[in-house]
Amino acid sequence: MKTFRFIGMVLLAIVMCVNFASCSDDDEDKTVIEQANLIGKWQSTWEKIHKVENGKEVVTSDEAYTSALLEFKADGTCIESRVEGGYTETSRWSLKDNKLTLSYSDGYSDVLTINELTATKLVLAFEDWDNLDDGSLELDDITTTTYKKID
């Protein structure tokens, strides 16, 4: 009888070990955004724009785009400019999970999704929503821009 009890305990221990080893942490699938990687100057390299028509995404542009500059500073400011000059705008930035919010002095804000952020690469997605006559919103297009760190 003691042998059966011992075998039962061993089998139970094995089942418990297998059960705990097979469980995974759901947080592992989340993209981890390191805020320190965002600080610095970024130049755009590629831009893809896709519209949403009848519920389907249609790519309208997918090409090199190298004129946009973003500089994120540790004090929470962001300077947007163009390589060729002629445009500069300063905003305040904040980061929560993978959502980057740029708040402008006129009270307007843009919320972008960080699809990827490493020490040298940044991929931002911006959703442009239209206000419909009935007060609802409709997704017009999504612009995904890839940047490389330049300093």
Q: Language-model features: where?
A:
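Bacterial N-terminal signal peptides that target proteins for export
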Residues: M1-V10
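Lipid interaction determinants
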Residues: S24-D151
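C-terminal motif of bacterial Sec signal peptides marking the signal peptidase cleavage site
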Residues: V18-S22
